């Protein structure tokens, strides 16, 4: 069908090479190759085709586009960050092989992976020299990834600095096990909770969290 439409004069570059972008996003390498051969712009919209291929884990298409000189580092290395976020480990390894470890926003790939709970990805990124930052911790904490936060705390041998606003976020989301973990690891939750958090907990009907707050003596401070 694609070949037929092109033969009928359809513009392969229409809408910023949208056809090529979709082929790259969904992994249709034969269609991607055909569109490129027909003149589709691989650099459209800041190299969007290769960024989509990387984000969705289509390594063969990433390699094909790099062979044709697409810029894997476009938009401040966003392909690497998005591949890490979506847990596309083989793509991340390949990009690192190509560009090395001196990439833009060097703590973001690990933070993005932490925000999705991808421990294997985090392990790899640590192995190539990325550091665990508070940003990575907060991404995992805010999204309720208890196992990931345990891993990050153990690896870094440090605790994140939990503010009122951070605690308020995880309370609103109902992440009771996260609150317990942080408290058990030494963060004094009962010293952070204030009347506003208590009121929000009640408003959101987070009764188990409210009971836990009572258990650790929060009411004495509000």
UniProtKB/Swiss-Prot annotation:
One GO-annotated biological process of the protein: innate immune response
SUPFAM superfamilies: Ankyrin repeat
Keywords, alphabetical: ANK repeat, Repeat
InterPro entries according to UniProt: Ankyrin-KH/SAM_domain, Ankyrin_rpt, Ankyrin_rpt-contain_sf
Pfam families: Ank, Ank_2
ANK repeats: 1-14, 15-44, 45-74, 76-104, 105-134, 136-161, 163-191
PANTHER family listed in its UniProt record: MASK PROTEIN (PTHR23206), PROTEIN KINASE DOMAIN-CONTAINING PROTEIN (PTHR23206:SF7)
Record-given protein name: Putative ankyrin repeat protein L36
């Amino acid at each position: 069908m694609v070949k037929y439409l092109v033969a009928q004069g359809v513009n392969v570059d229409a809408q910023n090479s949208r056809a090529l972008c979709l082929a790259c996003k969904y992994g249709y390498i034969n269609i991607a190759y055909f569109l490129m051969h027909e003149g589709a712009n691989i650099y459209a919209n800041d190299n969007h085709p290769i960024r989509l291929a990387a984000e969705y884990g289509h390594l063969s298409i990433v390699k094909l586009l790099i062979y044709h000189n697409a810029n894997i580092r476009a938009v401040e290395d966003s392909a690497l960050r998005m591949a890490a976020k979506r847990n596309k480990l083989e793509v991340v390894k390949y990009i690192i092989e190509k560009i090395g470890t001196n990439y833009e926003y060097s703590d973001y790939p690990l933070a993005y992976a932490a925000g999705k709970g991808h421990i294997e990805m985090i392990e790899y990124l640590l192995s190539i020299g990325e550091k665990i930052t508070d940003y990575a911790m907060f991404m995992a904490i805010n999204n309720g990834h208890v196992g990931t936060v345990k891993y990050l705390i153990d690896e870094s041998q440090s605790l994140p600095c939990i503010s009122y606003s951070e605690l308020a976020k995880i309370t609103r989301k109902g992440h009771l096990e996260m609150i317990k973990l942080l408290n058990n690891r030494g963060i004094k939750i009962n010293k952070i909770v204030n009347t506003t958090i208590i009121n929000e907990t009640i408003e959101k009907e987070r009764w188990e969290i409210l009971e836990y707050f009572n258990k650790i003596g929060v009411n004495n401070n509000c």
